Curated annotation (Swiss-Prot):
Name of the featured protein: Transcription factor btd
SUPFAM superfamilies xrefs: beta-beta-alpha zinc fingers
Record carries keyword Transmembrane: no
Record-level GO cellular component terms: nucleus
GO terms under biological process: anterior head segmentation; cephalic furrow formation; imaginal disc-derived leg morphogenesis; negative regulation of transcription by RNA polymerase II; positive regulation of transcription by RNA polymerase II; posterior head segmentation; regulation of neuroblast proliferation; regulation of neuron differentiation
PROSITE patterns tied to this protein: ZINC_FINGER_C2H2_1, ZINC_FINGER_C2H2_2
Gene: btd
InterPro entries on file: Znf_C2H2_sf, Znf_C2H2_type
Keywords carried by this UniProt record: Activator, DNA-binding, Metal-binding, Nucleus, Repeat, Transcription, Transcription regulation, Zinc, Zinc-finger
Top-rank taxon: Eukaryota
Major localization listed first in the record, in broad terms: nucleus
Length: 644
C-alpha cells in the first residue's frame, strides 16, 4: 500500500502502478492473467516491427517537414484544443470497455484502443490523477526500453529537464530540429495500423521524428536511461501534442529558451508582459502618465499641478492669481475652507494645515498611542518618552526638549538688560558733563559747584567709600576724607620726592598706566601743581600729592573734590560695562601689572565685601592682592563673577 501511495503521488510512475494493479487482478484471475500476458508480448513484438517500418518511412519525409514546421505548430495547437475534450471521453469509454470486457475480448479491445488508452488492457491513470500525466512517450520503465502509448490528449510536458535529458537532446542531430521532439510513438503506430483514434499525418510525422531521436540515442550507447530521457523530451513548442499550458500549475514560468530548439509559439513564457519588459514607459501603455506632455511644461506649471488650492487653480486656468506673491517673491497657497483663507508659502504647509480642518492625524506614537497631524509634532512628543533634551542654556546649563522653550528661558536671565543699558548711557552723559565742567574750571580758575552725584549700587550713606573696583580708588577715597581717616605716613624718601615735585614745579613726567581720562593712555603730566593733582588717581604717590595739595589751599581742595567726582563717574561707567559685557575696556590685552589692576574687573557688590582698610592700611604700596581674581582683562570674561 505504501508503494502504491508513493506511485500515485509520482506522476512518472503511473505505468509501474498500473502494473501493480494488474498484478492484483492476476491474483484474482490467474488464467486470464496468463492469457493476457501472452497477448501483451505478441502486441509488443507487433509494435516493435511497426516502429522500425515507421522509422524508415520518416527518413523520407524529414525534408518536407522542415519547410512546413511553422504551419504544423499552429495546426497542432488548434487540433489540441479540439481533440482534448473528445479524447477525454474516448479514454473514459475505453477504460470502461476494458473493465467490462470478457477475457476473450480483452485482446481485441486493447488492440482497438491502442491509440487512445494509456495501457494495453489496463485502466488508465487519468481517471485518478489530477496532476499532470507523464511525458508524451510514456514512462521510463526499467522492464522495457520501448515506451507504451498514452494518447496525445493526455500528454503533459515535463517542465524542468534532467541532465540526462539535456544530454540526450544535445547528442541528437542539430541539423533537424524535429529530432529533439518527443511526441507519442504509438499514436503514429496506430495511425499506420488504421486505428480509429489516430492523430493527424503531421503529428504522426513528428512522432516518427521522436522515434528516430530515441533510436539515435540508443545507438550512441547512452543506455536505457538516456533513451528514456530522450523520449521524455520536454519541448513545449509543439503544444498541439498536449493540453494547453495554462492547465498545469507553474506553466507560465516555463521558459522559451532553456534547451528548446524552437521557441516561437510560446510567447507567454515567464511573464505575460514580456513585450514591455526592460523598455521605457510609453504613453500608450500608461495613458494616465504621459512623459511627453510633462517634458514641455514649465517648472511653475509642474509645481502648480501638485497643488489644488484656489490660487494655483486660477494660475493653471490662465486667470490672475487671487493673492500675489509675498515679499520674497514666493507664490502663496490659500486654504480653500470658507472663513479660513490662510496663506502659506509652501504647498506642504498648506497640506498639513488642511489636516487640521479634516481632523486627520496620520502620525501615531507607538509608545502611548497618541496621534498627531504633523511629523515634527510626533518627533517632539517622542522626546517626552526618551527624555531627550538637546537644547541647553549656555548660562545655567539647563536643558530643554524644544528650542522655543529655551529661547523663552533665556529671557529670564536678561530681563533687566534694558535698565542696565539705560544706566550705562546715563553714566556716559554724566561723565561727559563732568569733562566739560573741568574744562570750564581750568579756563576760569574759580571753583564751580560740583556736579550732582548719580545713584550708586551700594545702599551706603557714604557712596564713595569702598566703591571703586581699582586699588588706586581705595587710596583716592581715603585721601578725599583725610580729616577723618588720615593715610599712613609714606616712606621718607617718597616724602622728599613728593615735596620736591609740588614745591619746585619742575617739568617732570609721571607715568600713568591706568589713567582715568577719556583717552585711557599713558600721558605726561603738566608742570602746574593743580594739573598734577588733577591728573592723579593713578598711583598711591599721586593720591598723597592730591591730599597735601588739598590741605594747603582751598582752591586746590575744591579742585581735588571735583576731580574726585570725575574719577568716580569714570569708574562707575566702567563698572557698568563690566557688569554688562563681562570685561573692562581700560585693561591692556596682554594683561596688567600687579600693583594696580588685579581687581580691575571686580563688580561693586564684590568690592564692598572687602574691609575698609583693604587698600589704605597696607604697609607697602606695590602689594600683591590676595583675592583669587585674574590679572588678564580678557580672561575675566569667562570668570563666573563676570556675567550678569
Amino acid at each position: 500500500m505504501i508503494d502504491a501511495a508513493c506511485n500515485y503521488l509520482n506522476p512518472y510512475a503511473q505505468q509501474h502502478q498500473a502494473q501493480q494493479q494488474q498484478h492484483a487482478q492476476h491474483q484474482q484471475h490467474a488464467q486470464q492473467q496468463q492469457h493476457h500476458l501472452h497477448m501483451q508480448q505478441a502486441q509488443h513484438h507487433l509494435h516493435l516491427s511497426h516502429q522500425q517500418a515507421q522509422q524508415q518511412h520518416m527518413q523520407h519525409l524529414t525534408q518536407q517537414q522542415q519547410q512546413q514546421q511553422q504551419q504544423q505548430q499552429q495546426q497542432q495547437q488548434q487540433q489540441q484544443q479540439q481533440q482534448q475534450p473528445q479524447q477525454q471521453q474516448h479514454d473514459f469509454l475505453s477504460a470502461a470497455a476494458l473493465l467490462s470486457a470478457p477475457p476473450s475480448l480483452s485482446g481485441s479491445s486493447s488492440g482497438s484502443s491502442s491509440g487512445s488508452s494509456p495501457l494495453y488492457g489496463k485502466p488508465p491513470m487519468k481517471l485518478e490523477l489530477p496532476y499532470p500525466q507523464a511525458s508524451s512517450t510514456g514512462t521510463a520503465s526499467p522492464n522495457s526500453s520501448i515506451q507504451s502509448a498514452p494518447s496525445s490528449a493526455s500528454v503533459s510536458p515535463s517542465i524542468f529537464p534532467s541532465p540526462a535529458q539535456s544530454f540526450a537532446s544535445i547528442s541528437a542531430s542539430p541539423s533537424t530540429p524535429t529530432t529533439t521532439l518527443a511526441p507519442p510513438t504509438t499514436a503514429a503506430a496506430g495511425a499506420l495500423a488504421g486505428s480509429p483514434t489516430s492523430s493527424s499525418p503531421s503529428s504522426s510525422a513528428a512522432s516518427a521524428a521522436a522515434a528516430a531521436a530515441a533510436a539515435a540515442a540508443a545507438a550512441a550507447d547512452l543506455g536505457a536511461a538516456a533513451v528514456a530521457s530522450a523520449a521524455y523530451g520536454w519541448n513545449t513548442a509543439y503544444s498541439g501534442l498536449g493540453p494547453a499550458r495554462s492547465q498545469f500549475p507553474y506553466a507560465q514560468y516555463a521558459s522559451d529558451y532553456y534547451g528548446n530548439a524552437v521557441g516561437m509559439s510560446s510567447s507567454a513564457a515567464w511573464f505575460s508582459h514580456q513585450e514591455r519588459l526592460y523598455q521605457p514607459w510609453s504613453s500608450q501603455s500608461y495613458p494616465g502618465f504621459n512623459f511627453d506632455d510633462i517634458a514641455f511644461q514649465t517648472q511653475l506649471q509642474r509645481r502648480s499641478v501638485r497643488c489644488t488650492c484656489p490660487n494655483c487653480t486660477n494660475e493653471m486656468s490662465g486667470l490672475p492669481p487671487i493673492v500675489g506673491p509675498d515679499e520674497r517673491g514666493r507664490k502663496q497657497h490659500i486654504c480653500h475652507i470658507p472663513g479660513c483663507e490662510r496663506l502659506y508659502g509652501k504647498a506642504s504647509h498648506l497640506k498639513t494645515h488642511l489636516r487640521w480642518h479634516t481632523g486627520e492625524r496620520p502620525f501615531l506614537c507607538l509608545t502611548c498611542g497618541k496621534r498627531f497631524s504633523r511629523s515634527d509634532e510626533l518627533q517632539r512628543h517622542g522626546r517626552t518618552h526618551t527624555n531627550y533634551r538637546p537644547y541647553a542654556c549656555p548660562i545655567c546649563s539647563k536643558k530643554f526638549s524644544r528650542s522655543d522653550h529655551l529661547s523663552k528661558h533665556k529671557k529670564t536671565h536678561f530681563k533687566d538688560k534694558k535698565s542696565k543699558k539705560v544706566l550705562a548711557a546715563e553714566a556716559k552723559e554724566q561723565a561727559a558733563a563732568a569733562i566739560k565742567l573741568e574744562k570750564k574750571e581750568k579756563k576760569s580758575g574759580k571753583p564751580l559747584t560740583p556736579p550732582v552725584e548719580f545713584k550708586q549700587e551700594q545702599p551706603d550713606t557714604t557712596p564713595l567709600v569702598n566703591y571703586a573696583p581699582y586699588a588706586n580708588l581705595y587710596q583716592h577715597s581715603t585721601s578725599a576724607g583725610s580729616s577723618v581717616n588720615p593715610p599712613p605716613p609714606p616712606p621718607p624718601l617718597f616724602q622728599q620726592q613728593m615735596t620736591t615735585t609740588t614745591s619746585s614745579a619742575a617739568a617732570s613726567f609721571v607715568e600713568q598706566p591706568w589713567s582715568s581720562s577719556s583717552s585711557r593712555a599713558i600721558q605726561p603730566a603738566t608742570t602746574s601743581a593743580s594739573s598734577s593733582s588733577s591728573s592723579s588717581a593713578s598711583s598711591p604717590a599721586a593720591a598723597v600729592v592730591s591730599a597735601i595739595g588739598s590741605a594747603s589751599s582751598p582752591a586746590a581742595s575744591a579742585t581735588a573734590l571735583a576731580q574726585h567726582h570725575y574719577a568716580a563717574l569714570a569708574m562707575q561707567s566702567e563698572s557698568q560695562l563690566a557688569a554688562e559685557y563681562g570685561l573692562t575696556m581700560s585693561g591692556l590685552a596682554s594683561g596688567a601689572s600687579q600693583d594696580s589692576s588685579s581687581s580691575c574687573h571686580m563688580k561693586s557688590e564684590y568690592a564692598a565685601s572687602y574691609p575698609a582698610d583693604f587698600g589704605a592700611g597696607t604697609a607697602s604700596y606695590g602689594y600683591p592682592h590676595p583675592h583669587p581674581h585674574h590679572h588678564n582683562a580678557w580672561a575675566a570674561a569667562y570668570h563666573p563673577h563676570a556675567t550678569a
